[in-house]
Regions:
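Rossmann-fold scaffold of SDR-type NAD(P)-dependent oxidoreductases
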Residues: 14, 86-94, 117, 142, ...
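C-terminal helical subdomain
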Residues: 178-181, 185-189, 193, 201-241
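Catalytic Tyr-X3-Lys loop
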Residues: 87, 103-123, 137, 141, ...
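Catalytic loop of short-chain dehydrogenase/reductase
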Residues: 113, 139-164, 169-178, 190
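Conserved mid-core segment of classical short-chain dehydrogenase/reductases
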Residues: 73, 77, 81, 96-111, ...
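Conserved glycine-rich Rossmann-like NAD(P)H-binding loop of the short-chain dehydrogenase/reductase
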Residues: 33-47
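Amphipathic alpha-helical dimer-interface segment in Rossmann-like NAD(P)H-dependent oxidoreductases
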Residues: 77, 81, 116-135, 173-174, ...
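Conserved glycine-rich cofactor-binding loop
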Residues: 17-19
């Protein structure tokens, strides 16, 4: 059985206030981790922190624009001041601007997706990973989509943003190999949540996945038994890549 105890480790959860972030926060808290919850809305982060019912010594909330490198550096300082270490980054930051044909896509659409998916990831990697390398242990994990490598029509800004983020983390995986730090991606299509079922009530849900299933996989990738998994794109939609 994998050792998924994260006792005394510090896990940064970016995009924590979303549905997946909330479930992952609970799962990683149950595994013993200290949590740094990041997002844009401090009110939502504080609400989540209250729901988790962790002692103050084990939780920190920080509101920031995560695509702003200076703000992310300040977050890193706050996390290190409180917990003295950064061990895991869970990156759930992202967004979608809707279906658009290539010929009707504006530069601002692409810039928005790069900002949300790529530049936020760059800022966090550059601020947090040096602390992992100093400790000779760390996990960088992000959620992506099969659309990054197999983009459908009418979705190019999103596919561009996700594929750029994947390129960054796969490059990082090469650069940190054999250091004790790993970088991996889990690929999902639709996360099975109440609001998604309201949007698509007639879906067969064959490729949908729950936040709990995603969180369990992320926990495994943080285990000691997963130390040799690096640079992986883990498909979590019931089909091969």
């Amino acid at each position: 059985m994998a050792n998924t105890s994260l006792q005394d480790r510090t896990v940064i959860i970016a995009g924590a206030a979303g549905g997946l972030g909330a479930v992952a926060s609970a799962a990683f808290a149950d595994a013993g981790a200290n949590l740094a919850l990041l997002g844009r809305s401090l009110d939502k982060l504080d609400e989540l922190a209250g729901d988790l019912k962790l002692p103050d010594a084990r939780i920190l909330t920080q509101a920031a624009n995560l695509s702003n490198a200076q703000e992310v550096e300040e977050v890193a300082k706050a996390v290190m001041k409180k917990f003295k270490r950064i061990d895991v980054l869970l990156n759930f930051v992202g967004g979608w601007i809707g279906s658009k044909e290539v010929l009707s896509t504006q530069k601002a659409d692409v810039d928005s997706m790069l900002d949300q998916h790529l530049y936020s990831t760059y800022a966090m990697v550059q601020a947090f990973v040096p602390h992992m390398l100093n400790a000779k242990w760390g996990r960088v994990l992000a959620v992506s989509s099969p659309n990054a490598s197999r983009p459908p029509g009418n979705n190019s800004p999103y596919a561009i943003g996700k594929s750029a983020m994947e390129a960054l983390l796969l490059s990082l995986a090469q650069e940190v190999k054999h250091s004790g730090v790993t970088a991996n991606l889990v690929l999902v299509r639709t996360i099975d949540m109440a609001h998604q079922r309201e949007i698509s009530p007639s879906e067969e849900n064959k490729s949908w996945i729950t936040p709990e299933e995603i969180s369990a996989t992320l926990l495994h990738l943080c285990s000691e038994e997963a130390a040799m998994i690096n640079g992986a794109r883990v498909p979590m939609f019931g089909e091969p890549l």
